[in-house]
Structure formats: structure tokens, C-alpha cells
Amino acid sequence: GRYGQQAHDQLAAAGVSAAIEVSGDAQRQAVAGAVTAARAGRLGLEADAVTWAAQRTYDTTWFPDVELVPTTGLVAGLRQVKDDGEVARIAAACAVADVALAEVRSRLADGPTEAEFGQELDLAMRRHGADDVSFETIVASGPNGAKPHHRPSGRRITEGDLVVLDFGALVDGYHS
């Protein structure tokens, strides 16, 4: 399905070759193959992400000879550690965001609206190599600066305004 295709495409873009199995018998076969190849007697399940019904199916039908161990945050913990290639990709995304802001910063003096400035910043990130923005860019000026997650509005940025920016670039699958 589309989730498997998206995962495949994103992994391929990051230079990773992997079989993607989202659900069903193909998932069971993929996991069983990995458990067998590793000669694993235990299999960790992310307790916050696996339903009770799925856990029972795994325990009684799919892997009756394997001890299932509930885990919490195991995968997230592994993702916290970055290799040199990942650090380089994150640094590249940060550089794109920095260069983009440097390019459009002077436009603040022209009095654009928050929305206009946000659009210019997003476009500048793309011009400098971003595949996308990391999230919806926040531009909040004057009294809007006190609003968490303010959406850029038609308010004009004027001299003396405090301007709060929250933005990021997505480059090669990594966010700044």
C-alpha cells in the first residue's frame, strides 16, 4: 500500500535497501525470517504501539516459541544515536535553513506581512536545496509573538516589532 511505498521511497532516498512489510502475512514472514536468522529467543514489542489483540496473535499464532518482551521507547532510543552520515545530513539541512534566513532577513525592513515573510523564507529554503520545510513556518510579530504556534497572518511587520520565527528545512530525509 501507500505507507509501504512511502517508507520504501524514503529509505531508498537515504541510501538504505530494505524490505518493507506493513501488515499481514508478509509482515509475519519478514519478522519470522529475521527472528530465525538472528536465532532470537526473545522478541521486543513496542508496548505503546502494539495492540493487545496483535500481541496475542504474535504470542499464540505467529511466534509461540519466542518470548515476547514489552519495550517502551526502544526504537526511539536507537534513533537518538546518529552516525557520521546522519550528522552530516542534519548539518546540511541546518546550513540550508541558515542561508535562507540570511537571504531574506533584510526583507523585514520592507514591512511584509507575516504570511509574505513566511512564504519568502520557505521559498528561499527550497532555492537553497531543501526538499521541503520541516513543519509549517511560524512568523509571529508584535503581539502575535506571545501566541504559541501562531499561524502567519496578514499583520504587517513594522519597525520595532519583535519577530518570532520557527522554521526548518528538510534535506535528504533529515530536518534542520
Role assignments for model-derived ranges:
Residues 1-34, 95, 99:
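N-terminal accessory/capping or targeting/presequence segment of soluble
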Residues 26-133, 144:
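Flexible, acidic/His-enriched mid-domain "rim/lid" segments that flank
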Residues 8-9, 54-56, 174-175:
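Short glycine-/acidic-enriched loop or helix-start segments at secondary-structure transitions
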Residues 13-17, 37, 59-62, 154-156:
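Short, solvent-exposed amphipathic alpha-helical segments in soluble enzyme
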Residues 139:
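Basic, ligand-binding patches in group-transfer machinery
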Residues 37-39, 133, 145-175:
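Acidic/histidine-enriched ion/cofactor-binding microenvironments in catalytic or ligand-binding pockets
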Residues 21, 87, 152-153:
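Short pre-catalytic strand/loop immediately N-terminal to key active-site residues, enriched for Gly-Thr
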Residues 2-5, 50, 144-146, 168-170:
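Short, glycine-/Ser/Thr-/acidic-enriched flexible segments
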